[in-house]
Amino acid sequence: MQTAYWVMVMMMVWITAPLSEGGKLNDVIRGLVPDDVTPKRILQSLISRRRFDGRALFVPSCIWKTCPYG
């Protein structure tokens, strides 16, 4: 519990320190995430890890509440 508390405190300091130097919150948050991490890349990574009977699972692309596959 004590470790989790200090991790939380350090994260707050890590985020707020650049803000006190005049940085914008959006820029600070973007600086914490690597450039190659995008929603598309994350989805591809998750799909490539999931296997079923040696075949890749098919993940339909659905838009909002309409899904042509189900």
Swiss-Prot record:
One function term, GO molecular function aspect: toxin activity
Propeptide stretches in the record: 23-55
GO cellular component, one term: extracellular region
Tyrosine amide found at: Y69
Lineage: Eukaryota, Metazoa, Spiralia, Lophotrochozoa, Mollusca
Organism (species): Conus mercator
Name by which UniProt lists this protein: Consomatin Mrc3
Tissue: Expressed by the venom duct.
Disulphide-bridged cysteine pairs: C62-C67
